[in-house]
Amino acid sequence: MSTAAPLVFALPKGRILDEALPLLEKAGIVPEAEFFDKSSRALSFATNRPDVKIIRVRAFDVATFVAHGAAHAGIVGSDVIDEFDYADLYAPVDLDIGHCRLSVAEPVSMVESGANARESHARVATKYPNLTRRHFEKLGVQAEVVKLNGAMELAPSLGLASRIVDLVSTGRTLKENGLVETSRILPVSARLIVNRAALKTDSARLGALVDAFRAMVAAKDAA
């Protein structure tokens, strides 16, 4: 990307967005009014800075856009970073927002019977196939992954999978669907990510952006 072109900053739709916007504003980047128009179908937005534009995409796509250089920087959960493990992604700042955890959950009835504890093979519904396989490999269990993009909690009750791996915050959704959290794979928080090549070729602008976010987190920790 040419250094004369605007920096492209990718923001995720969903749970992290509301917490990310105040940080972005503190970094001196404010989206145009259309960004906040819920009826708008636009995905690309101008900002108060002519050298920065924002794209709003699915959380999993933030990492892909940045890793492949279509966006220079973005904000995304550490779960997505760990799932894809892109070599071209650099995550210099833990933003201390979007806290949750990636966990294994099972039907309460199976936990009480101990049935899953005896399995050497498990069918698991998740949108995190790589993290799921790695987790179960460590346990000596062969995981057959059923890839879903949502409604994970339905899978056990409909016989699609015996367990699920998904993000958990309060555990309320699990409880309402007859599931219980049985193990935690990793803690999750949102990170600032940048494209490694872009950081080298446009170090002045991207370096300043990284420094701004890093300073905000440091100030928050010191408060």
UniProtKB/Swiss-Prot annotation:
Principal location class: cytoplasm
Record keywords: Amino-acid biosynthesis, ATP-binding, Cytoplasm, Glycosyltransferase, Histidine biosynthesis, Nucleotide-binding, Transferase
Keyword Manganese: no
Location(s) in or outside the cell: Cytoplasm
Entry's Gene Ontology molecular function annotations: ATP binding; ATP phosphoribosyltransferase activity
SUPFAM superfamilies associated with the record: Periplasmic binding protein-like II
Any one GO biological process: L-histidine biosynthetic process
GO cellular component: cytoplasm
Reactions performed catalytically: 1-(5-phospho-beta-D-ribosyl)-ATP + diphosphate = 5-phospho-alpha-D-ribose 1-diphosphate + ATP
Pfam families linked to this entry: HisG
Pathway involvement of the protein, from the record: Amino-acid biosynthesis; L-histidine biosynthesis; L-histidine from 5-phospho-alpha-D-ribose 1-diphosphate: step 1/9
Superkingdom of source: Bacteria
EC number: 2.4.2.17
InterPro entries: ATP_PRibTrfase_cat, ATP_PRibTrfase_CS, ATP_PRibTrfase_HisG, ATP_PRibTrfase_HisG_short
Tagged with keyword Methyltransferase: no
Gene3D superfamilies xref list: Periplasmic binding protein-like II (3.40.190.10)
UniProt subunit comment: Heteromultimer composed of HisG and HisZ subunits.
NCBIfam families: hisG
Function, as annotated: Catalyzes the condensation of ATP and 5-phosphoribose 1-diphosphate to form N'-(5'-phosphoribosyl)-ATP (PR-ATP). Has a crucial role in the pathway because the rate of histidine biosynthesis seems to be controlled primarily by regulation of HisG enzymatic activity.
Record comment regarding domains: Lacks the C-terminal regulatory region which is replaced by HisZ.
Family (UniProt): Belongs to the ATP phosphoribosyltransferase family. Short subfamily.
Name by which UniProt lists this protein: ATP phosphoribosyltransferase
Species assigned in the record: Novosphingobium aromaticivorans (strain ATCC 700278 / DSM 12444 / CCUG 56034 / CIP 105152 / NBRC 16084 / F199)
Primary gene name: hisG
